[in-house]
Amino acid sequence: VGIRRQCQMCIRDSITGTPIDDLKRVYETFAKTGAPDKAGTIMYAMGWTQHTTGVQNIRTMAMIQLLLGNMGVAGGGVNALRGESNVQGSTDHCLLWHIWPGYLKTPRASNVSLAAYNDKWTPQSKDPLSANWWQIYPKYSVSLLKSFFGENANAGNDFGYDWLPKVDDGKDYSWLSLFDEMYKGAFKGFFAWGQNPACSGANAGKNRQAFAKLDWMVNVNLFDNETGSFWKGPGVNPASIKTEVFFLPAAASVEKEGSITNSGRWSQWRYQGPKPKGNSLPDGQIIMELGNRIKAEYQKGGTFAEPIANLKWDYLTRGEYD
């Protein structure tokens, strides 16, 4: 066993470039956190999960912390480090397809009414000692609908629940599936907001082919990138591309003011430094202006205009974006 352990240490040494003595010191130091008066945390970045052995990495982290008693204690646990603070905001502020603000579930097609939606997603507990905080799920859902539609949301119209878009049951709307559907021609338009899927996607070549099947694309970013200019990529004939691309220059993080959330679930307010250059605008102002113009168009009517026409859009302060 000792020879095998030493051999494994040699392999780690050759792979990581870390001397064996230093590795031993790290292992021994962290193992000492498995004591009543100590705690240790494991902090990792996206590489651990996105690695080819990502599942094993995560399971191993959890097992190590459980064995050392480092779960459920102050200073313990397994904690992710974000490269960009508002990556955490993507979950806190419902930028992912499967959740809405407050971590409420995205309505499914089978949730035909607000009552059916609440019945589906409100957890039930027979344990008399269970706090079951989510038993008030219906209150959260009504509160969210009122924030969406304001005075237009009332008990008589199910608080506007029928105006919400619904996802098909059992269908995946995550990143890989989204671009696969785009590749199949299921999308007319695409907002590439603060991203560059022509380079960052798992199959960048397929993503670029998918862009060519769009009628239009809006690229919101600091600078033009490979996604916005996919039509002049290697081996592409621009004359054969039907996609109309619009570029909206956005302000950098230091050029705008606002709040962020991080992995520790605390919020931080960040003040503006330099003013945005040229005609670039903060993301929020771009969204605000788009919303104003789209609402103005839907006030004239159109197919299923009610959700947009009745949308509460009162984010201006003294007539200006704040």
Segments the model singles out, each with a brief description of its role:
Residues R25-T41, L176-K188:
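Glycine-rich phosphate/diphosphate-binding loops that line cofactor/substrate pockets in enzymes
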Residues T29-F30, A45-G47, G77-Q88, T303-D322:
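A glycine-rich phosphate-binding loop feature that marks nucleotide/adenosyl-phosphate handling sites
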Residues Q8, A35-Y44, A153-F159, F187, ...:
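Short acidic (Asp/Glu) and glycine-rich catalytic loops that position anionic groups and cofactors
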Residues G258-S259, G264-D322:
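Long, C-terminal catalytic modules of enzymes
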Residues L66-E244, P249-E257:
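Extended redox/cofactor-interaction regions of prokaryotic respiratory oxidoreductases
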Residues I15, Y44-T52, G83-S85, Q195-C199:
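Conserved short loop/turn motifs at secondary-structure junctions
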Residues T16, I20, Y27-A35, A62-G75, ...:
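Structural signal for hydrophobic packing residues in well-ordered secondary-structure cores
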